[in-house]
Amino acid sequence: MISCSDGPDRFPAPPIPPTTTVYANSEWEVLVEEDLIYGYGLSHESWNSAEDTTLPLKLDLYRPDEQSTARRPVFLFIHGGGFSGGSKSQEQIVHFGEFFASRGWVFVSIDYRLTGDRGTVPQEWINSAQNVPVEEANQFLAMYPAHRDARAALRWISAHQSMYGLDMGHLTVGGGSAGAITAVSMGISEEVDFLQEISIIDDPTLNSTHIGQTYAVHSIIDLWGSDTGLDVLEGLYGHQRFDTEDPPIMIVHGMSDSTVLFSEATDLKSRYDGLQLPYAWYPIQGAGHGPWGAQVDGKGLDQLIFDFITTQQGLLVE
């Protein structure tokens, strides 16, 4: 499959002096730390029921096997699966982890609470779910704890920046499908969103999620996702978060996608056009949902993402 893009970059990259080095080719072996706990979250017998258990939230961390004191850019990736399935160890994500860590990034892949976990949700989400088709209500509700957990993972990364030598000035968040919905929300919304709606009294597991940490997202990778999470945020709370400070985004979407409609991608592109923000646009002709094997000008997704991040973040490539 190839793209019929009308040009990968709508605007030129900002003139950022290169300060952090990555490598065009694989430079190091990759060390992987699996199942690191980044926090805890509640799981209810039914949505918000008093019967609950506490679940560990886990991530895998990929890093170069080298002893340099140089700080490394960070790439957090969120798996898809309709908020009801999927895994941080999905084959394509493992490939991304090895690809980027071998070239100088610290790459993080997370698991998060899904529909079957029934994480704690704000009452206004419960009320709003009454207006969602019955077959989609669980997915709708699971969106909140998924976002909340991704937010916790970003705070964990910030809390461990010294331990892992992380350069928080070059932070990318990406995902596929449902994970891309969450990634877009993480990049566009504010740090208090998907956090302050439930208090520590109602959900004491928040104490395990480094709530004092801060961070800023510098690039978003949207693989066949949408801005649905932001739409819900605006609909329920009146928070319209798009503005001229939003980070550059790379949008990849199959033009024949019947799961997350291609119109979702064009709508997001239009948001960026309206704000005159930088983006890369890759509509994949003839592709349905999840075109992991897509190529544009002979480049796969891994290389396209590499090019986008290094250009937009002003990374020095050797």
Predicted feature locations:
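Short beta-strand element of the alpha/beta-hydrolase
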Residues: A70-G82
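Conserved alpha/beta-hydrolase "acid-adjacent" motif
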Residues: S258-E264
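Short amphipathic alpha-helix adjacent to the substrate-entry channel of hydrolases
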Residues: S89-S109
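N-terminal cap/lid segment of alpha/beta-hydrolase-fold proteins
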Residues: A13-A70
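C-terminal catalytic histidine-bearing segment of alpha/beta-hydrolase fold enzymes
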Residues: T266-K269, D273-E318
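Primarily recognizes the serine-hydrolase "nucleophile elbow" in alpha/beta-hydrolase
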Residues: R148, A152-R241
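Short beta-strand/loop motif that positions the catalytic acidic residue
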Residues: E245, I251-H253, D257
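Alpha/beta-hydrolase active-site loop
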Residues: E124-S162
